A protein has these predicted regions:
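Structural motif
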Residues: 18-20, 63, 85-87
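C-terminal helix-cap and adjacent tail motif
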Residues: 88-119
Length: 119
């Protein structure tokens, strides 16, 4: 809704995306590793977001994974209960620019030496 987008605009730059999904972790329902009590909420939210992006692409939509947002503002504006933690935002819509072709990687790709450390 317009009201929801106005609330999100207080927390992040979403550049007019028509649809934004707030991906949250539910700490009351999260799986916990028994050895060290680690919750896998960030991992689970990442997998979920990735799958939603793949499906959005399949449906002809553009998507943008947004981590640059203020979770405190999202929590307050949407009155999220304490057990829900906003992990990321997923903006969806039709792209307003042309897609770049795969040939761009020949000139724009970071070299392997800059990405990988050998020891």
């Amino acid at each position: 809704s317009e009201e929801g987008r106005a609330k999100l605009d207080k927390a992040a730059r979403l550049y007019g995306a028509p649809t934004v999904i707030i991906v949250c972790a539910d700490h009351d329902k999260a799986w916990v590793r028994k050895y060290d009590q680690m919750q896998t909420t960030d991992i689970d939210a990442s997998i979920l977001t990735d799958h939603m992006m793949l499906e959005a692409t399949e449906q002809g939509l553009g998507s943008l994974w947004v981590c640059w947002f203020d979770p405190k503002i999202v929590r307050e504006e949407f009155e999220l209960p304490d057990n829900l933690e906003p992990i990321n935002l997923l903006a969806l819509g039709y792209a307003d620019t042309e897609e770049k072709g795969p040939d761009r990687h020949k000139t724009e790709r970071i070299s392997l030496d800059e990405l990988v450390m050998y020891k």
